[in-house]
């Protein structure tokens, strides 16, 4: 190879970063690639600049997807990593190869529809996902590499949270509430949620959109109310990675989030809230819209997590699970392998190996 290869990571949203970073750190071990993170301007630019500084990331900024497209066509990197669909890939593919690396393994149909606009390759997490995508898009290139986001935990590189810094008693058990933005359980929780679990530390790690988008203002109001309780920490927008909380928590409560799979894969108990706040046009005669949004994989959550069909049931089950000796069933492990693949800490290495072989 005559010159170093260039790889750009397109960071349209900050929460793409935990999926990219393990690959970037693996790339740094090779003397082949120059990497750069391309951030999109938005309301949290100052926060992102701090992340760039803390992680020592080589970075450029673009205004939006159209600006990013022009930038990529001008710079002509060898590879561009994307976390979602991207416009006019046919133009980009004249000069560059593209790789899609999704940020989660959740039950929404968007997991699969991201391949409606085919990249040069898409890295996927499990044999089941690989086979299904190959059936849906037989002309496209998929590589089953594993779930690289989890590599830092599996490899012992993730230290977890600082309990003292968060004002927590390390001797108390810790609950992680990690809801998604829609459909969400947030609005169905009691205003006294932290008081109902007063003997435990509670970390609330909402989706980035719940903390940033205007349409989820009511969610933020409730989240900030819960933050006022002494046993509760509300993750800030710059707490962009879920990994420290996955590492340190004893129990997760969630809803339609891929975090359920990530936490259960660590052989820890998960409560799956099936009581969701649906918009009026997703209820009653319009319930087909909710079903259309969620993939059939959503039904597998009941095999991995303990369903809670109401708020009161959730509180009761949370206490019971934290007071018991939990271990995942063999059946749950089979479903986890189906959705998240084998977690061996080597997914990032397999991605880099593919890149080395396809320079």
Predicted regions and their residues:
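Conserved catalytic-core segment of nucleotide-activated headgroup transferases in glycan assembly
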Residues: 17-27, 31-36, 150-225, 235, ...
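A short, charged/proline- and glycine-enriched loop
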Residues: 1-7, 94-96, 169-173, 199-200
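A donor-sugar binding/catalytic signature common to diverse glycosyltransferases
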Residues: 80-82, 89-100, 237-286
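Short acidic-hydrophobic, aromatic-tinged amphipathic segments that line or gate anion-handling sites
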Residues: 58-65, 233-238, 303-314
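Short, conserved catalytic or adaptor-binding loops enriched in Gly and charged residues
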Residues: 50-54, 135, 221-230, 293-301
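C-terminal alpha-helical cap of glycosyltransferases
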Residues: 343-359
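Active-site and donor-binding regions of nucleotide-sugar-utilizing enzymes
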Residues: 8-157
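Catalytic binding pocket for nucleotide-activated donors in carbohydrate/polymer assembly enzymes
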Residues: 258-339
């Amino acid at each position: 190879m005559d010159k170093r290869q260039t790889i750009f990571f397109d960071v349209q949203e900050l929460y793409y970063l935990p999926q990219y970073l393990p690959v970037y750190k693996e790339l740094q071990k090779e003397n082949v690639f120059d990497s750069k993170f391309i951030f999109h301007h938005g309301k949290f630019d100052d926060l992102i600049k701090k992340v760039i500084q803390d992680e020592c990331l080589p970075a450029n900024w673009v205004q939006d997807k159209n600006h990013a497209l022009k930038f990529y066509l001008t710079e002509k990197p060898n590879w561009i990593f994307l976390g979602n669909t991207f416009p006019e890939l046919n133009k980009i593919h004249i000069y560059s190869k593209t790789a899609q690396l999704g940020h989660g393994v959740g039950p929404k149909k968007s997991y699969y529809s991201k391949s409606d606009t085919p990249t040069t390759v898409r890295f996927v997490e499990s044999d089941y996902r690989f086979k299904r995508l190959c059936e849906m898009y037989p002309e496209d290139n998929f590589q089953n590499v594993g779930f690289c986001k989890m590599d830092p935990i599996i490899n012992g590189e993730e230290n977890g949270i600082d309990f003292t810094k968060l004002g927590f008693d390390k001797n108390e058990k810790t609950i992680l509430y990690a809801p998604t933005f829609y459909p969400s359980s947030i609005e169905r929780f009691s205003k006294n949620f932290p008081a109902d679990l007063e003997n435990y530390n509670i970390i609330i790690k909402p989706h980035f959109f719940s903390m940033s988008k205007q349409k989820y203002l009511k969610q933020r109001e409730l989240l900030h109310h819960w933050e006022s309780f002494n046993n509760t920490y509300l993750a800030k927008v710059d707490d962009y990675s879920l990994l420290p909380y996955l590492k340190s928590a004893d129990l997760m409560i969630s809803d339609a989030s891929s975090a359920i799979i990530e936490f259960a894969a660590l052989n820890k108990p998960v409560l799956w809230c099936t009581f969701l706040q649906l918009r009026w046009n997703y209820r009653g005669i319009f319930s087909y819209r909710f079903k259309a949004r969620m993939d059939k994989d959503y039904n597998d959550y009941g095999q991995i997590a303990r369903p809670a069909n109401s708020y009161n049931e959730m509180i009761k089950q949370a206490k019971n699970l934290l007071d018991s000796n939990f271990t995942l069933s063999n059946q749950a492990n089979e479903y986890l392998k189906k959705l998240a693949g084998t977690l061996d800490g080597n997914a990032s290495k397999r991605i880099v190996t593919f890149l080395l072989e396809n320079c």
